[in-house]
Amino acid sequence: TWYVRNQNNQLIKQLKNATNNYFKNYTKTKSSENLWTTFKNYKTMIAGKGYAKGFLSSNTRATNEYRDRIAVAYLLNKYFNPCVKNFFTQNGVKVDDDAFAISEMLQFIWRSAIRDGEQVWLYIPSSRMRNLLIQWINNTSKIKMEELK
């Protein structure tokens, strides 16, 4: 993954600094209002003062504990596990990496205050993940507009 290739690289420090800047200078939120995720093995490399305690594993489900968080950083670019993908493919099941990725991201974002209809700040540094979210919003909006006709 990107993290493995760059773990001793300036890019990890850049991601940490950008995340720190997002929470401190852009959203200006308190630590208790922040929620963020990355791969668990890289959490300590990215964690920063003022948001470290807001870490939540990206695959956490069925919790309302973070519903008061208004600033979210999704520091992942998700793909199917290659072994799982190969298993499904070999058994005739089509796997859609993009559908999987947007589903995972939406599940994570849903842990925040957005579940109560509140506005939240989103930081998604991966252009792929950001574009998937924008496409999903646009497609969902089009469907709702069609229903109103």
Enumerate the predicted regions with their spans.
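Positively charged, amphipathic N-terminal segments that serve as targeting/anchoring signals
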Residues: T1-S57, A71
